[in-house]
Amino acid sequence: MGIDINHKHDRKVRRTEVKSQDVYLRLLVKLYRYLARRTNSKFNTIILRRLFMSRINRPPLSLSRLARHMKKPTREGMIAVVVGTITNDVRLYKVPKMSVAALHVTEKARARILAAGGEILTFDQLALRAPTGAKTVLLQGRRNAREAVRHFGPAPGAPRSHTKPYVRTKGHERARPRRRSNV
């Protein structure tokens, strides 16, 4: 008598192609698919995988965080690679000179990087400059920085839970008859 093996959970849950209809993103996917296949470098495979990701999994990286990572002495003259958006940070007073490759850079962040004597590359320019990812630093923003993530975890009210409850309002005595002070 045979064993009935259940294959219900066998699928691997990850994207194998880009979901977006953006033609420019699809062109980049074509390019990095080629590079990942033809070069024996892990860098291109990682870039390709990150290009497939949803926007939630490609969080923005602030200019101050980028500067902090690139200021390390071992990263002198390297290109910062961000598969996502680089945003401005007004708390950062002085932007260091650096080379950055990103999918998108906000207007003010772009102006500040260029004013500091840095350069901003697109991913097709990066493919020409560093086809195997030599002299590059792969960076990404914090995925758990979203406000929505605060609501995830053990139920609010459970012991040692720091999960934020979903409430519309806070602090008013909502039961009827309300106190005169809240009228």
UniProtKB/Swiss-Prot annotation:
Biased composition (Basic residues): 161-183
Keyword ATP-binding appears in the UniProt entry: no
Predominant localisation class: cytoplasm
Cellular compartments per GO CC: cytosolic large ribosomal subunit
Gene3D superfamilies: 3.100.10.10
One Pfam family linked to the record: Ribosomal_L18
Name this protein carries in UniProt: Large ribosomal subunit protein eL18
GO molecular function annotations of the record: RNA binding; structural constituent of ribosome
Keywords: Cytoplasm, Ribonucleoprotein, Ribosomal protein
Coiled-coil stretches noted in the UniProt entry, renumbered to this chain: none
Subcellular location: Cytoplasm
GO term, biological process aspect, one: translation
Database matches in InterPro entries: Ribosomal_eL18, Ribosomal_eL18/eL18-A/B/_CS, Ribosomal_uL15/eL18, Ribosomal_uL15/eL18_sf
Membership in a protein family: Belongs to the eukaryotic ribosomal protein eL18 family.
